[in-house]
Amino acid sequence: MAKQVRKASKKTKLKVPSGVAHVQATFNNTIITITNPAGDVLAWCSAGASGFKGARKSTPFAAKIAAETAARKSMDYGLRQISVIIKGAGSGRESAIRGLSEAGLEIKLLRDITSIPHNGCRPPKKRRV
């Protein structure tokens, strides 16, 4: 008769005291990814994943709600302090940072790594409304 082998749970909750929040703010959406210092993803959320669709995804309010949701998910791992890396020129930049701090995370560092073209691709044409 075969022996019963007891399987241990492979997934264990990590305890990460500090991490990195990557905020990518585009003109259409805001994506917040929270990682540990090594770069492994702990939690993520976007304005679209928070329930906003269409033009409402690009609002600062949607970015704040997405940041608060990502922060709450990451606090399950014991996260308390974060460094924030911001990329992009969207409207949800500042409100995403405000949402992270209001959720209870202490912000240690702010870095802006928005790329600036040295006359690279042609930008989109100006809107005529």
UniProtKB/Swiss-Prot annotation:
Protein name in UniProt: Small ribosomal subunit protein uS11c
Compartment annotation: Plastid, Chloroplast
Gene Ontology process terms (BP): translation
Subunit structure: Part of the 30S ribosomal subunit.
Homology family: Belongs to the universal ribosomal protein uS11 family.
GO (cellular component) term, any one: ribosome
InterPro entries recorded: Ribosomal_uS11, Ribosomal_uS11_bac-type, Ribosomal_uS11_CS, Ribosomal_uS11_sf
GO MF annotation list: rRNA binding; structural constituent of ribosome
The keyword Ribonucleoprotein is annotated on this UniProt entry: yes
Gene designation: rps11
Key word Ribonucleoprotein present: yes
Pfam families: Ribosomal_S11 (PF00411)
Keywords on record: Chloroplast, Plastid, Ribonucleoprotein, Ribosomal protein, RNA-binding, rRNA-binding
Classification of source organism: Eukaryota, Viridiplantae, Chlorophyta, Ulvophyceae, Oltmannsiellopsidales
Species this protein is from: Oltmannsiellopsis viridis
